[in-house]
Amino acid sequence: MQIKDLFSKKKYATIPSERPKRDIPEGLMNKCSKCGTIQYSKELDKNLKVCSSCGHHYRLSAWERIGMTLDDGRLYEYDADMESVDPLEFPGYKGKLEQQRQKNPNLREAVVTGEGTINGHPVVVAVMSFDFFSGSMGSVVGEKITRAIEAAHEKKLPLLIFSTSGGARMQESILSLMQMAKTSAALSMFQGAGGLFISVFTDPTMGGVSASFASLGDYNLAEPGALVGFAGRIVIEQTIRQKLPDNFQTAEFNMQHGQLDLVVHRKDMKTTLGKLLDMHTVREGLSHGG
């Protein structure tokens, strides 16, 4: 062997595998974003999309949540065809709206409203979806929620809103911000007439939604670990120049500081809502004599 042979690269032969490569079907498994546990999607669905290892609550679409909450998953939908236009002719907005509708064929906007029952109790519901434009509140979202509030007022039914949002929709500017006042004013009239409003925060509920109707419930509930706040953590830390607690703006942190009434696991949500509705329902034949 010559010295130069010591520094020469060895040549390796590639032996083809006798076993064919098996492709794993897309969507067969999910990896938990919190603990990293890999689970079969079917098992995750059976567990209401809650991680069996750490309890992390995955985000749900509006229709998934409706299916888990309402009796038989049935909803008489309000304003199903209402959709956003481009009132301010914001550059690129129309195209983005169309992209969102193609990505979410079962949604026309970031909220679904309607009427159903929970444990036999009729209720008006509004369920937001983070999948559509990050759940941002524009004119149509505000209008649909306002109409749902007015329907509950007119029919004397309890109102239930599941919120999830990144905040106001910037492409609609002041028209978007106006929805904060509009929804809050409608709630004030509804609650002033004795209407019951149950608000449920889901991950995440931020910005103009958390600062308006979502925080005005007679009962304010949240799912475990839900991010609930107004401005983002980084913005606040840069403003006050202080390090915030690790659990800052979580549902648990908000409940500890009096901003929420109860943090409810997803598997217990329908039962809890049913109990609250029971408490506020006058049964037929109930005597009010004294």
From Swiss-Prot:
Residues holding Zn(2+): 32, 35, 51, 54
Reactions catalysed according to its record: N(6)-carboxybiotinyl-L-lysyl-[protein] + acetyl-CoA = N(6)-biotinyl-L-lysyl-[protein] + malonyl-CoA
InterPro entries: AcCoA_carboxyl_beta, Acetyl_CoA_COase_Trfase_b_su, ClpP/crotonase-like_dom_sf, COA_CT_N, Znf-ACC
Classification via Pfam families: Carboxyl_trans, Zn_ribbon_ACC
Obligatory cofactor(s): Zn(2+)
Name this polypeptide is given: Acetyl-coenzyme A carboxylase carboxyl transferase subunit beta
Classification via NCBIfam families: accD
Gene this chain is encoded by: accD
GO molecular function per UniProt: acetyl-CoA carboxylase activity; ATP binding; carboxyl- or carbamoyltransferase activity; zinc ion binding
Major subcellular location class: cytoplasm
Natural source organism: Paenibacillus sp. (strain JDR-2)
Pathway: Lipid metabolism; malonyl-CoA biosynthesis; malonyl-CoA from acetyl-CoA: step 1/1
EC number, UniProt record: 2.1.3.15
Keyword match Zinc: yes
Gene3D superfamilies xrefs: 2-enoyl-CoA Hydratase, Chain A, domain 1 (3.90.226.10)
Keyword ATP-binding found: yes
Subunit text: Acetyl-CoA carboxylase is a heterohexamer composed of biotin carboxyl carrier protein (AccB), biotin carboxylase (AccC) and two subunits each of ACCase subunit alpha (AccA) and ACCase subunit beta (AccD).
Binding note for cofactor: Binds 1 zinc ion per subunit.
Localization in the cell: Cytoplasm
Entry GO terms, CC: acetyl-CoA carboxylase complex
PROSITE patterns: COA_CT_NTER
Family stated for the protein in its record: Belongs to the AccD/PCCB family.
C4-type zinc finger locations on the chain: 32-54
